[in-house]
Amino acid sequence: GFSACSLADNEVTGTDVNYRSVWARDGCIAIIGSIELDDAEIRGAQEATLRTLFDRLAPNGQVPANVRLDDGTPDYSGVGGICSVDSALWTVIAFHTYVRKTGDLDLLHAYAARLRGVMDWLGALDSNNDLLLEIPEAGDWTDLFGRSYHILYDEVLWYGANVAYGRLLELLQHFDAASECLRRSQAIRSKILADFWPSTQPAANAPAERFGFA
């Protein structure tokens, strides 16, 4: 899959061995960014990245933060024992991006149960049943930024992951589950807009759409 650095040009020692890894967040962003390239080697790296990550899910559905290239060992936290919530969010979105572009339904069927596990793991982070994820302190793989609870970055990705998973369920012909997931995505979207851009206007006077995102 996509590695964190050029394996031929970088000699790593100590904790830098992490760079000899497939990273979930970085690899999945690379999939999304390169999906329109008509290149067999890149397409192979996209598929290999997804397989590498989904073959090494934790039993509870957690996506590894990275997988070592030398021995295939998954790491779910990294140096310092931190978590990586955004890795799972990007992984679901990247999987849909790949299947939508390639039409690889065999890959989708092979990992359908594992995708469900990832979504269940993510859903468990909604600890108060308010549709949004409650992110632990420094819970994203973004240089340990000291932020927590409802984070716009994560919530928008959560919305996107639900849309992506709903579309994958449609491809699996699980139409009832797909409809439920897509309806939930719109409820998440409305919750994000209401919480992050609140208004003091009475609800009856407020415009139907003050802000929007795709």
What spans do the regions from the language model cover?
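Catalytic cores of carbohydrate-active enzymes
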Residues: 2-5, 63-68, 130-136, 148-151, ...
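A short small-residue
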Residues: 29, 141-145, 164-167
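Aromatic-rich carbohydrate-recognition surfaces in CAZymes
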Residues: 19-129, 151-159
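Short linear sequence elements within intrinsically disordered, low-complexity coil regions
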Residues: 7, 24, 103, 201-202
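Acidic/His metal-coordination segments adjacent to aromatic residues that form catalytic metal sites
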Residues: 5-16, 65-82, 134-151
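A short, structure-level motif marking secondary-structure boundaries and short turns
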Residues: 16, 103, 173-174
